[in-house]
């Protein structure tokens, strides 16, 4: 359970507008992360949003149910924010092979792309993020 929590934190909590990390640096690291194996079933995660200056803006908990059919992983996410707001997102992730993934969700612009090596996953996408009564387009580079 501790390793599952650790990977959840890595995947969902650490994001920035630009990244100097390189997925190749994780090649051969253990334990090997296989996205579809990791997220099948129930997963809990916690996360945060921070501004470009590193100031904490918001925290959340997310309950995730993952199901696999053919070469598709579906993640049904239910968010609860620290201010009581609730939200949800359903990811449809295609398992492309060679440690590569692509995904869509209703608030994602275009298609997300992902690649894994060793015990890491890099997941990139553009999201229409709700802020008050409006939305802003945000680039995510999740590790």
Residue ranges and their predicted role:
Residues 37-61:
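Post-signal-peptide N-terminal segment of Sec-exported extracytoplasmic proteins
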Residues 62-92:
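Short, well-structured hydrophobic secondary-structure segments
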Residues 13-16:
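C-terminal motif of bacterial Sec signal peptides marking the signal peptidase cleavage site
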Residues 2-10:
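Sec-dependent signal peptide recognition
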Residues 43-50, 78, 124-130:
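Generic short beta-strand segments
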Residues 26-42:
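N-terminal helix-cap/turn-to-beta initiation motif at the start of protein domains
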Residues 20-28, 81-143:
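Calycin-type beta-barrel ligand-binding domains and close structural analogs
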């Amino acid at each position: 359970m501790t390793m599952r929590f650790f990977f959840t934190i890595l995947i969902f909590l650490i994001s920035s507008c630009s990244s100097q990390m390189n997925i190749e640096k994780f090649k051969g690291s253990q334990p090997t992360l296989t996205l579809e194996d990791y997220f099948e079933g129930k997963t809990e995660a916690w996360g945060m949003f921070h501004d470009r200056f590193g100031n904490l803006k918001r925290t959340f908990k997310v309950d995730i149910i993952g199901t696999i059919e053919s070469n598709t992983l579906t993640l049904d996410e239910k968010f609860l924010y620290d201010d009581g707001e609730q939200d949800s997102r359903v990811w449809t992730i295609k398992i492309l092979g060679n440690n590569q993934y692509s995904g869509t969700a209703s608030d994602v612009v275009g298609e997300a792309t992902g690649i894994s090596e060793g015990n890491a996953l890099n997941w990139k996408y553009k999201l229409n993020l709700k802020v008050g009564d409006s939305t802003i387009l945000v680039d995510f580079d999740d590790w």
